[in-house]
Amino acid sequence: ENARIRNNLADGINFAQGTKNSTVKNSNIRGNGDDGLAIWSSISDGTNAAAEENNKFLNNTIESGWRAAGIGIFGGKGHEISGNLIKDVFAGAGIRVNTVFAGHNFDLNDSGIKIHDNTILRSGTTNDLYNLHRGAIDFQQVRGTIKNVAIYDNKLLNTLAEPVITKNFEMGDNGNGEIRLSNNTIDNK
């Protein structure tokens, strides 16, 4: 709580290897070379870690990341991402939700993940480190399906890439049943 993290070459904070019931709150994360905040439900290196569970990122400012997302969610269950200001992430998405890495991903997500009441300002790119297009919110499914995620009441402002929400699978304007999008404001004036 109330932390300041500046200019490192990796994630600002990464909950991994079975982290449960942990919160980053009222903190400022700036200038990171990977995700500002991340939840990574990994089982890499032959570990038998449990899935990430019930973690929260609340009322933080994440700014000026230069390689990845402001906030990255790579699986687990029961997380809440709320009240964050994510701004000036010029080389990636403001919020990234995906199954790119091996791990528990969203297979055990029976309690749902809520991403709401965040403001994403001047984020996204047409050419990230992997030569991919990332919107203010980006979904990518590689190793399994993203499921039971609700994204609502967020503000996506002055985004740096179109479309504002990017994905590598079929999904309508309101989601696809497993991902629910509602009442998100997009303003690129």
State each model region's role.
Residues N7-F15, G31-N48, E52, S64-I73, ...:
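Extracellular beta-strand/beta-solenoid scaffold signature
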